[in-house]
Amino acid sequence: MTEESEETVLYIEHRYVCSECNQLYGSLEEVLVHQNSHVPQQHFELVGVADPGVTVATEAASGTGLYQTLIQESQYQCLECGQLLLSPSQLLEHQELHLKMMAPQEAVPAKPPPKVPPLGSSAIHYECVDCKALFASQEMWLSHRQTHLRATPNKAPAPVVLGSPVVLGPPVGQARVAVEHSYRKAEEGGEGAAVPSVAATTEMVTEVELLLYKCSECSQLFQMPADFLEHQATHFPAPVPEAAEPATQQETQVPSPTEAAVSQPEPLPASDHSYELRNELRNGEAIGRDRRGRKPRRNNSGESGGAATQELFCSACDQLFLSPHQLQQHLRSHREGVFKCPLCSRVFPSPSSLDQHLGDHSSESHFLCVDCGLAFGTEALLLAHRRAHTPNPLHSCPCGKTFVNLTKFLYHRRTHGAGGVPLPTTPVPPEEPAISFPEPAPAETGELEAPELPVCEESSAEPAAPGSYRCLLCSREFGKALQLTRHQRFVHRLERRHKCSICGKMFKKKSHVRNHLRTHTGERPFPCPDCSKPFNSPANLARHRLTHTGERPYRCGDCGKAFTQSSTLRQHRLVHAQHFPYRCQECGVRFHRPYRLLMHRYHHTGEYPYKCRECPRSFLLRRLLEVHQLVIHAGRQPYRCSSCGAAFPSSLRLREHRCAAAAAQAPRRFECGTCGKKVGSAARLQAHEAAHAAAGPGEVLAKEPPAPRASRATRTPVAPSPTALSGTTSAAPAAPARRRGPECSECKKLFSTETSLQVHRRIHTGERPYPCPDCGKAFRQSTHLKDHRRLHTGERPFACEVCGKAFAISMRLAEHRRIHTGERPYSCPDCGKSYRSFSNLWKHRKTHQQQHQAAVRQQLAEAEAAVGLAVMETAVEALPLVEAIEIYPLAEADGVQISG
């Protein structure tokens, strides 16, 4: 079965249906067998003049050029001359010409061939050898054959052999058809005419047999998958050897040279859908193989059974079967009875199989896998699934694939034949992968094409240490090359081969398609036992149940951050490893996730892939386009948050909405076992317990890790504690505050996470990495850009439930709701005036600051004036007293007089 045919399988109501003819099947194996009829085969027609007596093999070997052109038309070839015909009717007429040439001249002329309706090259009709009636299906032919067997059960047609099989050469060897030339005996022939003469044979019947299943070990062909799988099991050693049976007469009998020549199967080239040209020998001298590739059984006399012995029928109900295995199963139903399903009327041979089938109707899954959380209806299915978690699966292929089921493993091995997928060679480290980007998706479709990002080849393995293999993309190490190959195929490969027939979405695994189909049908068969919420897959249910338990089983060993999914943890580890394999060719920026590189790519082109058909706007993500179409053009917002009143276009957006009001009303059910403190989530409890562990047994926690900051609209003023009002302190001495988290090198501010620090650093650096594509204004955070873009789009998703007024930001809605409630939670500590919003309080506080600054400036001016006057007074008082000295002219007669 090719990969194209596997993509056409749908899964509806726990059954398989063929997309070509809408026929339902109960198992995957049945629909795979049925899909072979829809696969276009390679048919050939030889154009040119056929030279009688020259076969196709000799013509192809000699290269004379009589058959030069091969076109895909025919699949029926004459074994006498090698000529290819278009239909069984043409082959029938052609074979009658050979009979006329071989018959003597005085023989009675052959009857004209019956009028056979034209058969297409792809249709297979079954013809009765007694009355030459045509049937379109094998079941109708079998039921018709029973009427002849009941009338003459011992009468068997004796075939006449025209010639030996012709082995095709390479040009036409790719289309091999198993054709049986069987002839009826003349009506007047008695029992003595075991083999009629050629002259007496006047009519001929052509039966076309397709052997679709070929053993890769011994090149033996089979028609039914049950016989093929039964034969494949013979190539594998049994776990407990059975006792050797005594030699029968068949084993001791020495075959004749004719038997040995015919019974030896000639090796044929392997192919995915190979056929075989052969001529069944049904006379007593030569023994061929039955239509299932097995030798016919012998009787005690050593003679080969004819057609009557090969056609097995039940002696109780005269039902005809094609293999002894089917007959044996049918006879057991007569001995032990059957058990019928009351819902679908299906019959089962044992009560256990009926109970297992009834579990499929009820969709009950009582057996849960402890490793991945998947649920199964039976314990056998769970045990088979648990083998997939073991390091050594039961069946492994050299190409790297591993299988728990032998049937799927045998089907997979057929793909490695000639013309199939070759086996991988010795692991060779690949070169540096080159990244190519596609053109932006057209505006009509609105589809987003993923770029051809680098993928790990199946054979790429880099030995990091003796006996270990390292992945080149994520640096994970594996002990075996098969484990590395499996990891690269399912983790890093972007190939999605399985397609949803309804919406066209591609998936990596067929099980993902089955889970995805439930989104179209609305089926949610997996309810949560805690809250009764239904889910469409067991994995989603197991992931949801972690929200009830608060468990995060996947924890990072570097930073201690916990996750609910292992894939999220693996992506998180790439950040610590500084491994960014996806690089932008234009700006050189590297990313550790491919979709981030894809979104970054559109920033360079300036054109977003998802365009609205009603307006010229485009979006980076599909969900943004869907929200835009629902809210703006359709005006639909049916989902509303009961806590904050925010309206959303879908239930998914409502579930993703994290309402701070609901979080504040939620009870705190997680209690610390050390100090008795209760928190609202398991993550906060783990952070609180980690703080106890870091503080030590004898220390007291001075400060809890900072909780996520709420929006300004949802902040409420914190009332001072009674201890602070009374001015008393606790008896226990307060321990010094412990530094937790990274610190800003500019302002020495502490943060709880590295992400918060990176956002804070943009204040110092002035970086604004989120520009608006409409007006060019840049922002430091993506949430700010998201709120800003609603100004351009006109979206107002937050509506008031009282008056119907809508807002673009949830903070504005919270402020507006206080108009109806009359709440004013923000009060001024200076004058006691209260406000509805923090921004109004902030504006009011500025007036107090201005008044305070004016008063301070006035006080400073008065102080400066007073200081200046005081300085002047101090300077005047500090001047020393100076004695005045009067100087008069000296008289000759008078002496000097100094006034004291």
Curated annotation (Swiss-Prot):
Segments crossing the lipid bilayer: none
Record key words, sorted: DNA-binding, Metal-binding, Methylation, Nucleus, Phosphoprotein, Repeat, Transcription, Transcription regulation, Zinc, Zinc-finger
The organism of origin for this protein: Mus musculus
Comp. bias intervals (Low complexity): 244-254, 721-736
Keyword Acyltransferase attached: no
Any single Gene Ontology cellular-component annotation: nucleus
Coiled coil: none
Disordered: annotated span: 244-306, 690-741
Primary role: May be involved in transcriptional regulation.
Chief location of this protein within or outside the cell: nucleus
Asymmetric dimethylarginine PTM sites in chain numbering: R836
GO molecular function: DNA binding; zinc ion binding
Protein name as it appears in the record: Zinc finger protein 574
